């Protein structure tokens, strides 16, 4: 069971958590928000979830994978810190704001032997249906 940490407290992470739980391979462990009340409100539907307002403390906790769904401008810095903390990282789209940021994250992920990927859901797009129909 992978211990999951969430950065971001909008509706999107709730949907991600539902999907992650359906796999039977993830357990929500912790949530990070810049505001403790926001974090606590987000955690209400879940049992025994740790809430953090300090990103370093969050990343120092016992997590295997971090899902980042914060404001886009924060994705790069938060992902970089998570990788340096040796956490696998899933970043909501758009993952970063420039190709150079993505290249840096990929390099760091390789060096720290963690997985990194963008949470793109292409299968929901019309173009993907055309490909599916073709196959």
Regions found by a protein language model. Give the residues of each.
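Hydrophobic residues in well-ordered beta-strands that form the structural core
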Residues: 13, 91-92, 116-118
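Structured beta->alpha junctions
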Residues: 8, 35, 71, 94, ...
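N-terminal Rossmann-like dinucleotide-binding module
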Residues: 1-46
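Short active-site oxyanion
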Residues: 27-30, 64-66, 116
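Beta-loop-alpha module in the N-terminal Rossmann-like domain of NAD(P)-dependent dehydrogenases
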Residues: 46-108
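Short, well-ordered coil/turn segments that N-cap beta-strands
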Residues: 26, 87, 113-115
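A contiguous active-site-proximal alpha/beta segment in oxidoreductase catalytic domains
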Residues: 96-135
């Amino acid at each position: 069971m992978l211990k999951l940490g969430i950065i971001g407290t909008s509706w999107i992470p709730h949907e991600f958590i539902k999907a992650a739980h359906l796999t039977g391979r993830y357990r929500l462990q912790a949530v990070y928000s810049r505001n403790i009340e926001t974090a606590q409100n987000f955690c209400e539907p879940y049992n025994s979830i740790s809430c953090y307002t300090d990103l370093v403390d969050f990343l120092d906790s016992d997590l295997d994978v971090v899902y980042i769904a914060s404001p886009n401008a924060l994705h790069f810095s938060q992902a970089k810190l998570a990788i340096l903390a040796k956490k696998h990282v899933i970043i909501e789209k758009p993952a970063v704001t420039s190709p150079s940021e993505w290249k840096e994250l990929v390099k760091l992920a390789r060096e720290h032997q963690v997985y990194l990927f963008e949470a793109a859901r292409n299968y929901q797009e019309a173009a993907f249906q055309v490909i599916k129909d073709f196959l």
